[in-house]
Swiss-Prot record:
Component of the TIM23 complex at least composed of TIMM23, TIMM17 (TIMM17A or TIMM17B) and TIMM50; within this complex, directly interacts with TIMM23. The complex interacts with the TIMM44 component of the PAM complex and with DNAJC15. Widely expressed. Expressed at higher level in brain, kidney and liver (at protein level). Residues 1-44 form a transit peptide. This is Mitochondrial import inner membrane translocase subunit TIM50. The FCP1 homology domain does not contain the canonical D-x-D-x-[TV] active site, suggesting that it probably does not display phosphatase activity in vivo. Residues 143-286 form the FCP1 homology domain. Residues 87-353 are mitochondrial intermembrane. Residues 25-60 are annotated as: Disordered. The gene is TIMM50. Residues 49-60 have a biased composition (Low complexity). Changing residue 269 to S: In MGCA9; uncertain significance. Coiled coil: none annotated. Changing residue 113 to C: In MGCA9; likely pathogenic; severely decreased protein abundance in homozygous patient cells; results in reduced protein import into mitochondrial matrix. The modification Phosphoserine is found at residues 45, 341. It comes from Homo sapiens.
Length: 353
């Protein structure tokens, strides 16, 4: 019995050791070669990191294609709508179609040609003046027509726009406007020719001219649009260019007739400004001297940065020269009078019987 018990205990301990070894082998993964392990790891990481793309979706390229298709459809629809709206015949007040020169063409050609003509005329309306004769004919007797025409810009010459948080946009009147109008109205036909729109400029002109010195008003639609500038074409004024003076703060405004213009510096709103008084004296001097062609005078000041300052310097120099001439003349007259009185004393005239 003792021997059998010893054998049984040995068998039981052997079974325990065998089961432990089997469990250890099952729990421990089999060893692999280093290259094979790295390859498996990289495959696993690639699968873990890569986007899980679902079937049927194409990513950003699909959205881009859809956007392009929608833009193309909208553009085509807009083009067809424009051709349909502007390509029809104009109608009269009764709703009847007005025939034009395109009626004999095919319908599609009619639509396209009318649309092209509409936009061409619209562009021409922006670029060209509204009329080749912007002003009516000069007044005839017994009415009075001033001998010269003065063309004035509004913004920068007569007014200065200012903006504040409390009041918004306001226009400040330049000092000397009343004096300018009063002194030049008998000599010049005053015309406001501004690059502002009529809706903006009309009430401003009413505020600066309550007494009605301004004869005519011309706005942006009367200018000629060239290279981004609104140019005032003197040849469209229906006046003699030899007697037209343009005052503006931009030389581009009278680029077609550079010797008809006086370019002033834009007014910055300074209340002590006296430019309009100097301008009045300058233009009054031209008119009172009866200059036949103002371009011969304005040509001398075309290259000056400040034409009015140059005029004042020349005027001051001429006054000094005139004073010297008068002083010399007065001195010579006094000498002649002295010699004449001495001669009469020496050789008295014989009395007539």
């Amino acid at each position: 019995m003792a021997a059998s018990a010893a054998v049984f205990s040995r068998l039981r301990s052997g079974l325990r050791l065998g089961s432990r070894g089997l469990c250890t082998r099952l729990a421990t993964p089999p060893r692999r070669a280093p290259d094979q392990a790295a390859e498996i790891g990289s495959r696993g990481s690639t699968k873990a990191q890569g986007p899980q793309q679902q079937p049927g979706s194409e990513g950003p390229s699909y959205a881009k294609k859809v956007a392009l298709w929608l833009a193309g459809l909208l553009g085509a629809g807009g083009t067809v709508s424009v051709v349909y709206i502007f390509g029809n015949n104009p109608v009269d007040e009764n709703g009847a179609k007005i025939p034009d020169e395109f009626d004999n063409d095919p319908i599609l050609v009619q639509q396209l040609r009318r649309t092209y003509k509409y936009f061409k005329d619209y562009r021409q309306m922006i670029i060209e003046p509204t009329s080749p004769c912007l002003l009516p004919d000069p007044l005839q007797e017994p009415y009075y027509q001033p001998p010269y025409t003065l063309v004035l810009e509004l913004t920068g010459v007569l007014l200065h726009p200012e903006w504040s948080l409390a009041t918004g946009w306001r226009f400040k009147k330049r000092p000397g406007i009343e004096t300018l109008f009063q002194q030049l109205a008998p000599l010049y036909e005053i015309v406001i020719f501004t690059s502002e729109t009529g809706m903006t400029a009309f009430p401003l002109i009413d505020s600066v001219d309550p007494h009605g010195f301004i004869s005519y008003r011309l706005f942006r639609d009367a200018t000629r649009y060239m290279d981004g500038h609104h140019v005032k074409d003197i040849s469209c004024l229906n006046r003699d260019p030899a007697r037209v003076v343009v005052v503006d703060c931009k030389k581009e405004a009278f680029r077609l007739q550079p010797y008809n213009g006086v370019a002033l510096r834009p007014w910055d709103g300074n209340s002590d400004d006296r430019v309009l008084l100097d301008l009045s004296a300058f233009l009054k001097t031209i008119a009172l001297n009866g200059v036949e062609d103002v371009r011969t005078v304005l040509e001398h000041y075309a290259l000056e940065d400040d034409p009015l300052a140059a005029f004042k310097q020349r005027q001051s120099r001429l006054e000094q020269e005139e004073q010297q001439r008068l002083a010399e003349l007065s001195k010579s007259n006094k000498q002649n009078l002295f010699l004449g009185s001495l001669t009469s004393r020496l050789w008295p005239r014989s009395k007539q019987p």
